[in-house]
A protein has these predicted regions:
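Catalytic histidine-centered segment of alpha/beta-hydrolase-like enzymes
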Residues: 253-262, 266
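Alpha/beta-hydrolase-fold serine-hydrolase catalytic core, especially in secreted/extracellular enzymes
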Residues: 275-289
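An N-terminal hydrophobic leader/cap segment in hydrolases
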Residues: 1-5, 289
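Flexible "cap/lid" subdomain of the alpha/beta-hydrolase fold that forms the substrate-access gate
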Residues: 1-2, 12-17, 24, 60-96, ...
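A short, glycine- and basic residue-enriched loop/turn
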Residues: 34-35, 103, 253
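Conserved HGGG/HGGXW glycine-rich cap/lid loop of the alpha/beta-hydrolase fold
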Residues: 15-64
């Protein structure tokens, strides 16, 4: 088992894995996972010559679990990642995110462009696409509305041996582990608070201005069997990327790409990270008069 360490940053304890040496790669999981999601990617990236940092995001795994909804705004969680990288002496990591971790990675990319090398988003596309979702995507995201009722959602999800939760999750991901993790004190409310604080990732900015362009080289990966996120979200993300953009569709995989297609994901990561230059580095410096 890979050893975890803990550091207190941005007002919360963050547990994390830190393995290997080389250019840093930060892996960000989503709901209802932990750094354990990346168990197939960590050794492959370390063997590929990278330093791999995989935190348990706030509210999950062995990290702190504030119970207030406002503790889970996307800007707060981006600040967690910035503070963690500073604490660990990392200035400009590669960022790889899945599910909510991908949403955080996108936001980090356009808020902190000079603190990012390469970006990889798995399953979840740029929030600008979700600002105007299709009817089909709205229908697929019905569960996000169900999670909005503090106390009621928790009670219904736990009832009858977590029956409803298991029906929502299906047999995908680490389904048995999820129930054990969410049964820990405060864990279910903390996880659902991600949805309550960020009903629409695009609404977090609350601005009429367009999204800042993503300058980093970006890779989007989507699984054809994903029932929660439709292809439109990832396929349409390129228009928000000013740096090099690449989209990959994996046919025999669902939402949990790191588990469903570990070899393909690892191959894509190793073939992409560190291979391109950010858009802001391609500009010629202004000549001084």
């Amino acid at each position: 088992m890979i050893e975890k360490k803990t550091v207190h940053v941005n007002g919360v304890d963050i547990a994390y894995v830190d393995e290997g040496e080389g250019d840093p790669v930060v892996l960000l999981h989503g709901f209802p996972d932990s750094s354990y999601l990346w168990r197939n990617q960590i050794p492959a990236l370390v063997e590929g010559g990278f330093r791999v940092i995989a935190p348990d995001m706030r509210g999950f795994g062995d990290s702190g679990k504030p119970q207030e909804v406002e503790a889970y705004g996307m800007q707060t969680i981006v600040n967690d990642i910035v503070a963690l990288t500073i604490e660990l002496g990392v200035r400009r990591p590669h960022l790889v995110g899945h599910d909510w971790g991908a949403a955080i990675a996108w936001m980090y990319a356009f808020l902190m462009p000079r603190r990012l090398d390469h970006l990889v988003a798995l399953s979840v596309g740029h929030p600008g696409v979700f600002a105007t979702p299709s009817i089909e995507q709205r229908a697929a995201s019905w569960y996000m509305l169900f999670y909005q009722f503090p106390g009621v959602s928790e009670e219904l999800l736990r009832r009858n041996g977590w029956r409803l939760f298991k029906e929502i999750m299906g047999r995908d991901g680490d389904h048995d582990r999820y129930v054990r993790d969410l049964a820990r004190p405060g864990a279910l409310t903390a996880g659902l608070n991600w949805y309550r604080a960020n009903r629409s990732p695009a609404a977090e900015l609350r601005t009429s201005r367009p999204f800042p362009p993503v300058l980093a080289p970006a890779l989007g990966i989507w699984g054809a069997g994903d029932k929660a996120l439709l292809e439109e979200g990832m396929a349409g993300s390129g228009k928000f990327v000013k740096g090099p953009w690449r989209y990959e569709r994996i046919e025999d995989a669902g939402h949990w790409l790191p588990l469903d297609a570990p070899d393909e994901v690892n191959k894509l990561l190793l073939g992409f990270l560190g291979t391109e230059r950010p858009a802001h580095e391609e500009r010629r410096p202004r000549r001084r008069l």
